[in-house]
Structure formats: C-alpha cells, structure tokens
C-alpha cells in the first residue's frame, strides 16, 4: 500500500524514527553495566563490521580467535614485562564442573560468555565475577559414551544479540545474549543411528552460523552445516568425504574425492571420518572460509581403502565459499592418513613476505608434527617444517607431498611419533605480526600402533582391543610399550 503522506512529511517521520532509535540505543548503553538493557545494547552491535573494527584495537574479544584471521594477538599494552609480576587474584568463578574445560571466553564491554563441560554456557560480569545467567542444554549423561575425549566444549559465537552454542549431543542453540533464554534450536545430526558429537565453537560468517561435528573414532561421515543466524533455517551443508558410491554424489567435489578411495574397503559403512570438530577461519576480502578436516574412520588406511589412495578430503585444509558452501580448493597435509593426524587444529591467516613477494597465507600446525605455510588464495603449498620429533616422514617435497618413512605404514607394531594425541592438538595458537612469530603449545606422546588384523566395523568382540569402547580404529594401541626416546618426556 502506498503512503498518503506528502514526501516532506514522510522524510520528517523517517528522521524522527531514526532519532528515536538513536535515543533508545543511547539510553540502553547508559544503563548500568551488566544490566539486561546494557547487555542487549552492546551485544546487538556485534556483527561482521564490529569484529573487523575490533581487530585494529582489540578492546573486546568478540569472536573465537579474536578476529576472523584468528590471530589471538591483542594490541593492548596495559600489561607488559615490567608489571606482569604485579598481577593477582581479583575474583574466582565456579564453573561447577569436575570435567574438562577447554573453552575460549568471549568478552564484550565487560560481559564474558564461557562454556564448561556438558555444553553449559555462563554469562559473567568481568568487573565483579558475578553470574548474570547460565544455560544448561540438559545433555543426557549417557551420551558421554559417544565421545572419544570427554564432554568438553570449546566455546560460543556471538552475533547481533545472540549467543550460539553447539551441544555435545549435536544440537545448535541460539540464546538471547542478555537473558540466556532460548531463541531457536536445531538438531545438526542427520543420522541419529551414528554417534555424532559437537565440541567445537560455532563461527558466524555473513549472517550464517556454521558448525561441524566429531565422532570419527566411532564411525561417522564428517560435514559442515550453515544456519541462518536469525531464524535457524539451514542454508547449506558440505560433506568432507564421499558417501556410498552406489548413490549419487552431492557435488563434483565428492565425485572427485571418491576416486581417491578404494570401494573394496566400503569406507561408507564405517563413515569415512573427516569430521570438522575445531578450526574454521574466514577471509572477508577473498570471501573464502577455511576449514581443517579430521582423521579417517577407521584409522587404519588399509582397512578403509585397501588399494591405497589419498582419501580426500581427510586431514586437509579446505577452502569453501561461505555463501553457498561450495568447494573452492584444498591442500591435503596427510594423504592417506593412517595415524589419526587430524588437520582440525587452529589455523591463522596473515600476509608474509616470501622470496621478496607479499603473499596471503595460512599458518597451520596440525597433529602430524609439521608447521605449514599455505597460499590461501589457491591452496598452493609453500613450506612444511617439523616443530617436534617426527618419525613418519622425513619432510615434504616441492609438490607438497610427504616423504614417508618405510616403517610408517608397517603392519607390525610401530611407535608413532607424534602419536594420535598429535604434536599440536586443540590448544590455542597465536601470531604476532610485529615479531613474525607464531606461538602454540607442543607435545609429544608416542603411541605404539599395530594393525588389528581381525577388525570389523562395530564388531564389539570380547577381548578385541578398543572394541568395548565402541572405537573403530582397525589398530591396536600400545599392544606393546612404546620404545621411542620421546616417550615419558
């Protein structure tokens, strides 16, 4: 219906509306710190523009890795080498959990959002340590048996007044940032007969909440799903590995990937793996999002693909179009993964001068023990250097292929270095552009691996290694003690 007001009056009414909105916003910002009105106002402003603007001053921590590049590098200078020894305890807050806590807190204008085990979300006033609200998704406790590595959660996403959390039992929940009340909830698990879990933090890119999953040890097929941040409507889904080749593939990327698997292994029965349970980054200028994919299901390469093959897109960095979820490029860090060498560890986007040329790169330190520099415009391999003891490969050739050692794929017992815990795991990584240094914790826990010749998917055979846990590895773990010198350090 057309307006009957004269144009001049329409303009006056429109201007009045804008002024009224501005006054309401100012009043909300002037509300007492930590009040629902204050929280609603400051969190409503968190969007793509705010996250990018904050990266230049880092007054807040509005996104999982601080910024879209996930540098985790604060530009604040209030704490330095000269006064760090003066820091002391101001307050404590009880997360009410005796289980693992792996979350990165988000902080906006003094309001902290942090998760604990069982996907419980806490909103805390950092000025006082006072609880503002908490949200418990009531994950059934028996669901714990479907997770490999505790009922942890790595954090939330924040966008336009909402807090988004993935729950251990596979739901994605949108909460009102001011009250903790549920706005919408979606089940992200496409097949409830499979033991999918969610432990990673969602990311919000261009109004879409993107979440992956875990469960490769138990036999699942990995995928990412994007949901509309406002309504929860599913926008796209991208699988990391191909499904049953007897059925049509979802896209050309899956058809291409299937050629790198051997159907004799019936990988689709055991899921294939490749779950995205952690790292996602985004380059607004290139309009590309980057994801790291997980290990194979089962672990044993011979079991899932007897004739070999790279098994795309396991243990890879993959670039996707965030608008559509379409595949753009990939670089596989561990072709034919045989050791649980996931590539889901944190990745950082930065620009480096290499051979006299400025290049847009990804910095990545995955489980396999090599530190990678990859061109993020096209996936071209630049370099890979070991950052810890490594015995499965001596290095990478100029084409970006690992130079494997003969014993790495032996059928006999073999000390895997790094072991399945990885040289670097879920622990945060950061980059200081001033020093040009990347910082991340390194570990080395060698594990003895041997082929489980009697393995069958979900056999649950009494006395068979790992069978009672529901794990589908095709491997025996520490059937004999590791002898590597790194063991026990």
Residue ranges and their predicted role:
Residues 2-16:
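Bacterial N-terminal signal peptides that target proteins for export
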Residues 32-89, 245-255, 401-402, 480, ...:
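Blade/loop signatures of beta-propeller domains
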Residues 61-65, 100-120, 145-171, 195-218, ...:
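Repeat-blade elements of multi-bladed beta-propeller folds
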Residues 93-104, 134-157, 185-201, 239-279, ...:
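Extracytoplasmic beta-rich repeat domains
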Residues 175, 222-233, 310-325, 374-379, ...:
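Beta-propeller blade signature
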């Amino acid at each position: 219906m057309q307006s009957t007001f004269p144009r001049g009056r329409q303009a006056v009414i429109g201007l009045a509306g804008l002024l009224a909105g501005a006054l309401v916003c100012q009043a909300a910002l002037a509300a007492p710190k930590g009040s629902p009105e204050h929280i609603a106002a400051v969190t409503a402003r968190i969007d793509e523009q705010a996250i990018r603007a904050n990266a230049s001053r880092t007054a807040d921590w509005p996104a999982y890795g601080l910024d879209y590049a996930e540098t985790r590098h604060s530009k604040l200078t209030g704490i330095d080498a000269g006064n760090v020894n003066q820091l002391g305890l101001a307050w404590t807050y009880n997360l009410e959990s005796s289980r693992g806590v792996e979350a990165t807190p988000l902080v906006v204008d003094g309001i902290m959002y942090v998760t604990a085990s069982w996907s419980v979300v806490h909103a805390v006033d950092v000025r006082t340590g006072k609880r503002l609200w908490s949200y418990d998704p009531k994950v059934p406790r028996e669901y714990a048996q479907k997770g490999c590595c505790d009922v942890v959660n790595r954090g939330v996403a924040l966008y336009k007044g909402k807090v988004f959390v993935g729950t251990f039992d596979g739901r994605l929940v949108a909460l009102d940032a001011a009250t903790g009340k549920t706005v919408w909830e979606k089940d992200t698990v496409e097949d409830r007969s499979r033991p999918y879990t969610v432990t990673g933090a969602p990311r919000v890119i261009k109004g879409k909440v993107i979440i992956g999953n875990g469960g490769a040890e138990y036999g699942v097929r990995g995928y990412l799903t994007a949901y509309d941040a406002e309504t929860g409507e599913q926008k796209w889904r991208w699988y990391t590995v191909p499904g049953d080749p007897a059925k049509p593939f979802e896209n050309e990327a899956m058809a291409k990937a299937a050629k790198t698997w051997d159907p004799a292994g019936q990988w689709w029965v055991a899921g294939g793996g490749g779950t995205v349970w952690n790292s996602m980054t985004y380059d607004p200028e290139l309009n590309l999002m980057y994801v790291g994919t997980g290990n194979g299901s089962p672990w044993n390469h011979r079991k899932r693909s007897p004739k070999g093959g790279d098994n795309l897109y396991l243990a890879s960095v993959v670039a996707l179009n965030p608008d559509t979820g379409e595949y753009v490029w990939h670089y596989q860090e561990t072709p034919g993964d045989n050791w649980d060498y996931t590539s889901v560890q944190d990745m950082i986007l930065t620009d480096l001068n290499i051979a006299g040329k400025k290049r847009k790169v990804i910095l990545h330190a995955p489980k396999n023990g090599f530190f990678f520099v990859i061109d993020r415009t096209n996936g071209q391999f630049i370099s890979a250097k070991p950052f810890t003891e490594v015995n499965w490969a001596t290095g990478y050739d100029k084409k970006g292929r690992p130079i494997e050692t003969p014993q790495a794929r032996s059928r006999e017992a073999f000390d895997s270095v790094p072991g399945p815990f990885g040289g670097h795991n879920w622990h945060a990584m950061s980059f200081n552009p001033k020093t040009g240094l990347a910082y991340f914790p390194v570990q080395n826990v060698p594990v003895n691996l041997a082929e489980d010749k009697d393995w069958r998917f979900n056999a649950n055979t009494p006395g068979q290694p790992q069978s009672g846990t529901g794990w589908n590895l095709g491997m025996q773990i520490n059937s004999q003690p590791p002898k590597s010198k790194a063991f026990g350090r």
